[in-house]
Amino acid sequence: MFIDKLIESIKAKKSPVVVGLDPRIEKTPQFIKDVAFKRKGENIEGISEALYLFNKGIIDAVYDIVPAVKIQVAFYEAYGIEGFKAFFKTAEYAKSLGLMVIADVKRGDIQEVAKMYSKAYLQNQLFDAITVNPYMGEDTIMPYVEDAIKYNKGIFALVKTSNKGSKDIQDIKTTKGEYVYQSVARMINRISNSAIGKYGYSSIGAVVGATYPEEAKVLRKEMPNCFFLVPGYGAQGGTVEDIMDCFDENGFGAIINSSRSVIYAYQTPYWKDVYSEYEYAQAARAEVILMTGMINNGLVKRKYIAC
């Protein structure tokens, strides 16, 4: 079962950190672009090759210290077919090194369309889990739930997202007197009961932003069986203190994603005087180690058992 495998990988790596592979060509080190453009030309093919080579370096640097990577499809989809090739090659390479792969695709559409999206990702051996958007209703996410159970995959449904504008819809109060995100949370928690693993968590999880710690505290109680995928740490402003209530009393229950703060760590004030662009991957590894240590120390301070 997906969730059991994820928890076991977190235990083995002693880290709940997920590295987000959201590469931007304008921030890719020049030496990587030079190699890629020489191979493929200074065109869409060359750009896509550069993104893949950049990702490959990050994966090589972190595969032994994190349980999973999250690949945001938009950063590849922007370059058409060649970008998709880089997306799939990245997933394939990560899998070859034993990493779990989360495809961050945030799919949400009517049921018949959802079946095709599910076929594309959850029936693909390269991906262990995907993100989905449940805000069109329960019927629109059931194809993903059914395939997750059938193929031992996972889904993370958007519940309370990390962006500032999430309040525009998610924080509206319903006629029942609760926030929209709470209604969605209860729906996802109920559905999650159909895919509980041996550690008490479900393969049907939730996306809960690090930038809303008070809401996360409420949602941890509302969704006791759901593992949280937590974006918003680092570059978006989420801190160690903000994410503590995403975890349960045993130090599990959440994976914390960091994208820009890790993959471009060599450009940050903390690391820029230590690592050059040629050492971007080493800087990413150093940032993951630092982040993992801070999270685990935070869990210890909260009298939790560290991962």
UniProtKB/Swiss-Prot annotation:
**SMART domains on file:** OMPdecase
Q: CDD domains attached here?
A: OMP_decarboxylase_like
Catalytic function, reaction form: orotidine 5'-phosphate + H(+) = UMP + CO2
- The EC class name is lyase
What residues form the catalytic site here? K106 (proton donor)
InterPro entries from the UniProt entry: Aldolase_TIM, OMPdecase_type-2, OMPdeCOase_dom, RibuloseP-bd_barrel
**What's one GO BP annotation on this UniProt entry?**
'de novo' UMP biosynthetic process
Pfam families membership: OMPdecase
In which pathway does this enzyme or protein participate?
Pyrimidine metabolism; UMP biosynthesis via de novo pathway; UMP from orotate: step 2/2
NCBIfam families given in the database record: pyrF_sub2
| Family statement drawn from the similarity comment of this UniProt entry | Belongs to the OMP decarboxylase family. Type 2 subfamily.
Identify this protein by name. Answer: Orotidine 5'-phosphate decarboxylase
The source organism is Thermoanaerobacter sp. (strain X514)
